[in-house]
Design a protein with these regions (language model features):
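N-proximal low-complexity "stem/linker" segments adjacent to membrane-targeting elements
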Residues: 1-23
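A glycosyltransferase accessory/donor-loop signature
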Residues: 2-9, 44, 58-59, 141-147, ...
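Conserved glycosyltransferase catalytic-site signature
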Residues: 22, 75, 79, 186-193
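Short, acidic, metal-binding catalytic loop of nucleotide-sugar glycosyltransferases
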Residues: 31-39
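Short, hydrophobic beta-strand segments that form beta-sheet elements in well-ordered domains
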Residues: 40-48
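Active-site-proximal specificity loops/subdomain of glycosyltransferases
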Residues: 47-85
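GT-A fold catalytic core of metal-dependent nucleotide-sugar glycosyltransferases
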Residues: 65, 74-127
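Conserved catalytic core of nucleotide-sugar-dependent glycosyltransferases
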Residues: 108-169
């Protein structure tokens, strides 16, 4: 890979199971192509032998094949980002995210950093989320409030050792959870990364990274468990770039939509049509 831009890119895991995560990664790739002015390359980690539609191939920078986990809960490979990324500088994303604005300034600000996690999230109204409803384990164990849905890292020796510790926790999570108060019932990527960070680093994690987190109980409304059953939303492309309004609030930050049925064939077609306009 040649050129400055090739040294920076996005990475996501899209291992299909109950849901079509590769399709979500395709939509994510389109949202990056339509929103990012400089760095818009997305590499995708998929199940071995996964058949990728031709139109997806044109938008994925790299396709990285890994073994399919036995469990339907496809997070077991989330420790592997460090070894699998093709980039010198990587922003890791959950594949159920959308971008509407350019984040080139983020990349610039991250140039003198080596590892940064999102620690603050907002709801669809743009208000900072303070609820710990989904974060009892973090609160009970004084873990750093890290979110792996969007984080950045460089290839460094210290980070290599950190990711080795993350791997150890992933592979022995039930034993590690015995050391925690109020542990989750299942393996949590956020908990594993936060626990490793607490052990390995002596630092604060506050920074500017931010995304809109659409878990229903984090909004300023009394919603159904599936937020998209309570809140109206619609896409527009008046300026030849997609925009999303949720309950008439324009979405500015990376949008972690969570609900897989939020992505319909109509949304895919909307993005494909918009991409053709560029």
């Amino acid at each position: 890979m040649l050129g400055e831009n090739m040294n920076k890119g996005f990475l996501t895991i899209a291992q299909n199971g109950e849901h079509d995560y590769v399709k979500m990664a395709y939509l994510l790739a389109m949202s990056l192509k339509t929103s990012q002015e400089k760095y818009n390359k997305l590499s995708v980690i998929v199940n071995e032998n996964e058949e990728i539609p031709e139109k997806y191939l044109k938008l994925f920078d790299n396709i990285i094949y890994v073994e399919k986990p036995d469990s339907e809960w496809k997070i077991q490979n989330k420790w592997r980002y460090y070894g699998l990324t093709p980039y010198d500088e990587t922003i890791v994303l959950d594949c159920d995210m959308l971008f509407f604005n350019d984040i080139s300034t983020w990349w610039k600000c991250l140039e003198d950093k080596t590892l940064e996690f999102t620690t603050k999230t907002i709801n669809y109204r743009g208000n900072e989320i303070t609820s710990t409803y989904y974060r009892k384990t973090f609160e009970s164990n004084n873990l750093p409030n890290l979110h792996t849905a969007l984080f950045y890292f460089k290839k460094t020796k210290q980070n290599e050792y950190y990711f080795r510790l993350v791997k150890m926790i992933f592979e022995n999570w039930e034993e590690f959870y015995k050391l925690l108060k109020d542990p989750p019932k299942f393996l949590s990527g956020d908990v594993a990364y936060a626990l490793a960070a607490k052990v390995w680093f002596n630092r604060k994690w506050d920074n500017f990274l931010k995304f809109t987190h659409m878990r229903s109980r984090l909004q300023d409304d009394d919603l159904f468990d599936e937020w998209n059953q309570s809140l109206p939303s619609f896409f527009t492309n008046y300026n030849k770039k997609p925009e999303l309004k949720v309950n008439n609030f324009n979405q500015i930050y990376p949008f972690h939509y969570i609900q897989k049925d939020f992505i319909t064939d109509e949304v895919i077609e909307f993005y494909e049509d918009t991409l053709r306009l560029l």
